[in-house]
UniProtKB/Swiss-Prot annotation:
EC numbers, comma separated: 3.6.1.27
Reaction(s) catalysed (UniProt annotation): di-trans,octa-cis-undecaprenyl diphosphate + H2O = di-trans,octa-cis-undecaprenyl phosphate + phosphate + H(+)
Transmembrane segments: 2-22, 44-64, 85-105, 113-133, 163-183, 188-208, 223-243, 255-275
The gene coding this protein: uppP
Molecular function per GO: undecaprenyl-diphosphatase activity
HAMAP family per record: Undec_diphosphatase
Compartments (UniProt record): Cell membrane
Keywords per UniProt: Antibiotic resistance, Cell membrane, Cell shape, Cell wall biogenesis/degradation, Hydrolase, Membrane, Peptidoglycan synthesis, Transmembrane, Transmembrane helix
Reported function: Catalyzes the dephosphorylation of undecaprenyl diphosphate (UPP). Confers resistance to bacitracin.
Gene Ontology cellular-component annotations: plasma membrane
Protein name per Swiss-Prot or TrEMBL: Undecaprenyl-diphosphatase
Highest taxon, organism lineage: Bacteria
Organism whose genome encodes this protein: Streptococcus pyogenes serotype M6 (strain ATCC BAA-946 / MGAS10394)
Topology in the lipid bilayer: Multi-pass membrane protein
Length: 279
């Protein structure tokens, strides 16, 4: 029944809206949830669905940060306009590693890593990394406390960290936040740049998935279009809340709790995979 599929789409949209911005891996969570709750659709649609519903999350970022990201915003001084263009240049530079590395390798990683064990391992590894980095930095002051002070070189290397998220379970936001902190930025700068970098990255990735889906000879019927729209709209609404939560959270707390969550979830997934294999 279509109503059941739409309820599932709402549920997946909630998962996407929450996990896209928290450093816990949205794709990993969607794949995990679909072990137990699946859309009654073919594999090609589900693979495309998992990526394209990110469009709702991207639009949420664009809405929240529209004034900050718009160089033509009325009332901006010449200096503020210059800083906005510089920010966009940093974002473009940070996209280069993904264009050169992640895009060509995407299909291979999708074929070999999109199942439970690699997701679990990635969750645990990066969970440990978050805890270790936060302990290492506990007594250190970040070198970069404003986006305007971030160098183009730093932006490029943050983009290199983003490439790591090609492995499901890594988390795009987790990889870029972790990379930014390692490179000396504050948590606030790391989170902000992650949000901004998501706009071209996720638009491009979602677009590629949609085009590939169509070029492979698939088509969308009315029900599938409705499922995508409902899931994306839900992801948009939930993302508005998740982004505001994370921006407020990082002003007062570190990312240790997310590291612990990743380790616990990854461990449970390994146990589940073991029993599923044995029994």
């Amino acid at each position: 029944m279509l109503i059941i599929e739409l309820l599932k789409a709402i549920f997946f949209g909630i998962i996407e809206g929450i996990t896209e911005w928290l450093p816990v891996s949205s794709t990993g969570h969607l794949i995990l949830v679909q072990e137990f709750i699946r859309l009654n659709q073919d594999k090609a649609f589900i693979e495309m669905f998992n990526i394209v519903i990110q469009l709702g999350a991207i639009i949420a970022v664009m809405l929240i940060y529209f004034e900050r990201l718009n160089p033509f915003q009325p009332g901006k001084t010449a200096r503020e306009v210059q800083l906005t263009w510089q920010l966009w240049l940093k974002v473009v530079i940070a996209c280069i590693p993904s264009i050169l590395i992640a895009v060509p390798l995407d299909n291979w990683f999708e074929a070999h890593f999109y199942f439970m064990v690699p997701i679990a391992i990635a969750l645990i590894v990066y969970g440990i990394a978050f805890i270790w980095i936060e302990k290492r930095n506990a007594q250190q002051e970040p070198a970069v406390t404003e986006l305007a002070r971030m160098s183009y070189k730093t932006a490029f290397f943050i983009g290199c960290f983003q490439v790591l998220s090609i492995v499901p379970g890594t988390s795009r936001s987790g990889a870029t936040i972790l990379g930014a902190i390692i490179l000396g930025t504050s948590r606030t700068v790391a989170a902000d740049f992650t949000f901004f970098l998501a706009i071209p990255t996720m638009f491009g990735y979602s677009g590629l998935k949609a085009v590939k889906f169509l070029l492979d000879g698939h088509h969308l019927d009315f029900a599938q279009v409705l499922i995508l729209l409902v899931a994306s709209l839900t992801a948009f609404v939930v993302s508005l809340l998740a982004i505001r939560f994370l921006t407020d959270y990082v002003k007062k707390h570190d990312f240790t709790i997310f590291g612990k969550y990743r380790i616990v979830l990854g461990s449970l997934l390994l146990i589940y995979s073991f029993f599923k294999f044995v029994f």
